[in-house]
From Swiss-Prot:
<comment type="function">
    <text>Cell wall formation.</text>
</comment>
<keyword id="KW-0547">Nucleotide-binding</keyword>
<protein>
    <recommendedName>
        <fullName>UDP-N-acetylmuramate--L-alanine ligase</fullName>
        <ecNumber>6.3.2.8</ecNumber>
    </recommendedName>
</protein>
<dbReference type="InterPro" id="IPR005758">
    <property type="entry name" value="UDP-N-AcMur_Ala_ligase_MurC"/>
</dbReference>
<dbReference type="InterPro" id="IPR036565">
    <property type="entry name" value="Mur-like_cat_sf"/>
</dbReference>
<dbReference type="InterPro" id="IPR000713">
    <property type="entry name" value="Mur_ligase_N"/>
</dbReference>
<dbReference type="GO" id="GO:0009252">
    <property type="term" value="P:peptidoglycan biosynthetic process"/>
</dbReference>
<keyword id="KW-0963">Cytoplasm</keyword>
<dbReference type="InterPro" id="IPR050061">
    <property type="entry name" value="MurCDEF_pg_biosynth"/>
</dbReference>
<dbReference type="GO" id="GO:0005524">
    <property type="term" value="F:ATP binding"/>
</dbReference>
<dbReference type="Pfam" id="PF01225">
    <property type="entry name" value="Mur_ligase"/>
</dbReference>
<keyword id="KW-0573">Peptidoglycan synthesis</keyword>
<keyword id="KW-0131">Cell cycle</keyword>
<dbReference type="GO" id="GO:0008360">
    <property type="term" value="P:regulation of cell shape"/>
</dbReference>
<dbReference type="GO" id="GO:0051301">
    <property type="term" value="P:cell division"/>
</dbReference>
<keyword id="KW-0133">Cell shape</keyword>
<dbReference type="GO" id="GO:0005737">
    <property type="term" value="C:cytoplasm"/>
</dbReference>
Amino acid sequence: MIAFNMDEHQLKHIHLIGIGGISMSAIAEILLENGYHISGSDMKESNLTHKLRDHGAEIFIGHASENIQNPDLVVYTAAVKADNPERIRAEELGIPLADRAEMLGQIMKKYEKAIAVAGSHGKTTTTSLISLLMEYSNLDPTILVGGELDEIGGNIKIGQSQHFITEACEYVESFLKFYPFIGIILNIDEDHLDYFKDIEHIKSAFKKFAQRIPKEGFLIASYDDAHVREISRDLDCHVITYGIKTKSQFMAHNIEFSFEGLPSFDVSFEGKTIGSFSLNIPGLHNVYNSLAAIATTYVLGVDPVAISKHITRFKGIHRRFDLLGEVKGAKVIDDYAHHPVEIRATLEAAKKYPHKKIWCVFQPHTYSRTQALLKDFAKSFYLADHVIITDIYAAREKDEGIVNSQGLVNLIVQEHPAQYIGGFEEISRYLYDHIEAGDIVLTMGAGDVYLIAQMLLAEK
């Protein structure tokens, strides 16, 4: 149950702990636009804190009890623990507290047509694509995405309509605090096993998310995914299905890939062709993402001709098959893939790209994920010619000594050549010494592996 209801409080001043984060800063910007007095704290200055200060927010660097200056509400991120001095002070003063997901859910309630994009993979790309299709179709949405989107100058754009769109993350069941009119489920996979017990627990969370959609609302469901099919049954809301293999309302046909691996395809709705579509983002996984976007905007009343025209304008987002440059005639591409399914999809996209050899540099993300999916990770790199594994990026976790990157390499080499190199500078030098013109260097992971790509490009 949601502990905080914005409608029950007369709020003027809201304080955000961790205001410099990409999501919290966007929430702060929306609240500022709606006339709230905003204060907040973060551990360091950034472009986001400077931007918020310019918009009128009061920003404190560092966390301290004296930063709590009688706000009506305190909002905190998952990274802010119960022993944070500002949380402690708010509790002492009896000030209501809400976590980031609760606050975002309360904002969603203010919009008649809030859209929440859920799924184990593809959320940021699909949210960005739907956002731009809505924007180009003059629906003027308020947009909050989890990545940098050049077309809106960041990750937040405040519109004046009743449309709102954001990602809906399943981790710690955050999305069960949201209020979508349209919910989208792209796929369901085993992930975040430091919280979820197993796939049944994960499916249960997604089912509860779908049940939050009102009777007059819509679930946009990927019917090629067996788990999504299962949880899409027996819902009160309208269910709109899409797929490539399984009979669905929206289906992609005649899929072809250009010389550079870019897909084009026809789409039918309930058996009738509604248009031909070409993407400027590679990979079959992006055909699925675009089908979700096409179905969503079609439900919103956008003409398929307009969807087809505008979909080609989407060039992708930062850290999603992001072509950063060339060194020694080899293309350097960076991607956020950090799950076995995502690794395979990204390598499949790279394989369709013109190349001699694919050099894959993967940084495992969190010890818990690496341990839980170790065997799946080991089987994910078969499309790469050379595999380099870096040290594990710990994120929120501590190293318990149970799993390490050399252990992953030991499993990979049973099927495919791979090596462990811990240091980023050492990896960059190794790549520079071995790559040739026409090769692809692909850095992958949700941590800071992109720094290797930047180091390599600096070598030239």
